[in-house]
Amino acid sequence: CGLRKGGKHYFALDITDTLSPKYLWEFPKTPGVLDRIGQSWSEPAIGRVKIEQGGDLVEKWVAFIGGGYDPYDEKKGTEATTGNIFFVIDILTGEMIKEFSGLVLMRHSFPAPPTAVDTNQDGYVDKVYVGDLAGQMWVFDVSFDEISKTSDSQWKGQRLFMAPKDLLEKHNCYYQPAVA
């Protein structure tokens, strides 16, 4: 879970034994990543993916986490100084598997929880949807294609939708998108 307005970190606990929970990890682990994260509002979406590791494909349980809330990004005409980044984290170790940043038009923070979707019903997440503070909806393709053998090195993100610019206020996205 995230610290929300109290900080920029996420942490994981093993609560298999509810009488004796165990600390697992904290993210981020490096100052360079921490400098780019906003307040950790985003409740992670959890799912399985296939990734390439040492030339082999392995199954991983992951957390999908938005880059966080940047209070400066709420003002019309401004862009985020932090939080305009999206992560895929190994849920057992807290290690970052993938960082989506620097994409065209990815200039606003991601405080909302993402929605992970298994589009082909194979038990693995294929798409992750999340909104940003500019009213943009993003989709991150984290699928594995058995035919072309695409894996995490080919994962990509793109803007799916943008709220109309002619409106007086920005359309900040604070809530998890519903996907049907």
Each language-model region and where it sits:
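Extracytoplasmic/lumenal domain signature
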Residues: 1-180
